[in-house]
Amino acid sequence: MMKFILDIVSTPAILVALIAILGLVLQKKKLPDIIKGGIKTFVGFLVVSGGAGIVQNSLNPFGTMFEHAFHLSGVVPNNEAIVAVALTTYGSATAMIMFAGMVFNILIARFTRFKYIFLTGHHTLYMACMIAVILSVAGFTSLPLILLGGLALGIIMSISPAFVQKYMVQLTGNDKVALGHFSSLGYWLSGFTGSLIGDKSKSTEDIKFPKSLAFLRDSTVSITLSMAVIYIIVAIFAGSEYIEKEISSGTSGLVYALQLAGQFAAGVFVILAGVRLILCEIVPAFKGISERLVPNSKPALDCPIVYTYAPNAVLIGFISSFIGGLVSMAIMIASGTVVILPGVVPHFFCGATAGVIGNASGGVRGATIGAFLQGILISFLPVFLMPVLGGLGFQGSTFSDADFGLSGIILGMLNQFGSQAGIVIGLVLILAVMFGVSFIKKPSAKEE
């Protein structure tokens, strides 16, 4: 039974489809409308997941070629890798904390101004796993582990979307949907940077192309060509012989590079199609939940939901974030610290999202500089998170996104300086502050 529940809540397509169905039922929609809304939401999320898989499958070989081409070694942050190891020991605790965290998230949304229902199931699973490991080693077991872990997760699920909601309103033009992706600290940094030094009237989507290059306005074309240049350069440095022998199963290195570039663009195209399908269904369906269960609540959805608003910023953000990762790596090598290699997957998904958010608040400069700083942030946070995880027996692996780093460091410090009491007091104080600010007159999302 527990495995069945874990499978449901960790499968975003099923989880969000059930949420959509619940919303439509609460609105007393007719059965055909409920079935249609649930299925289209389910299929939309599968389309997005499929597109993300295509992108990830095109980026993994790039990372291998990049490391070989430039003779690099170090730690590549990867959520999936560390979670796969941790679940073998902490699987049951993770499942219970995940379920408890979702309940606390709904309760916090119901009784505070943090009206965000976090619906990104795989990120919820990863965060629950990290919390389970840290609290277990701190000495918590059974019910205290589940309740405190669930409370910590519920708090993070509620606060994370709030970090960036101001910029989501600027991006979407309304306050109906939130961003549910545990790298919101980086997105906030990008949006804040854009608002300080950027000019949002000069959008990445208004970049002027000469008439002879007008075809580059098509995002699929521009992404394919840009990525082809990047892939071919790395393939040349890696060497065709190495690629044919180790990666491409005999396909010529340059041909393989072109294939990966096209695969990357295809993945982005599929993601954008899925996002459009989801947003057409989940936002109206969520109205029922907002009206009946959690007044004024907002669905917090995975990061690809923002890509349709600024496709050019997606590519600009990815490249800028990756450059930030390269600069950070050079600093680490020079300073003699542990070296964090720029993981292409987190730099794409987090960098692209930071680019879109930065563009909303500061145009081209916001997208470029904001995503660059976000790339530096997700490079250095793992350096400080690794001692926390290293002491738990996970040397050589770490989480990739900003909120994992921030949350893990805070929980680790509370445990280090106050042991179990420190963690309990810290979580209670954070929850008290959340309730406290909820009694203050609430500003609009644009003012927050």
Stretch-by-stretch model annotation:
Residues 1-51, 92, 96, 100, ...:
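Signature of multi-pass transmembrane helix bundles
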Residues 44-95:
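Membrane helical hairpin/interfacial module
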Residues 51, 55-56, 63, 336-340, ...:
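Membrane-proximal extracellular juxtamembrane segment immediately upstream
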Residues 1-3, 56-61, 76-88, 103-115, ...:
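Short juxtamembrane and helix-loop transition motifs at transmembrane-helix boundaries
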Residues 70-76, 96-102, 122-129, 150-154, ...:
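Mid-membrane cores of alpha-helical transmembrane segments in multi-pass membrane proteins
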Residues 52, 68-70, 92-96, 183-188, ...:
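Short, charged low-complexity intrinsically disordered segments located at boundaries
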Residues 55, 72-73, 88-92, 184-188, ...:
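Hydrophobic transmembrane alpha-helix bundles
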Residues 110-114, 303-383, 387:
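Hydrophobic alpha-helical bundle architecture
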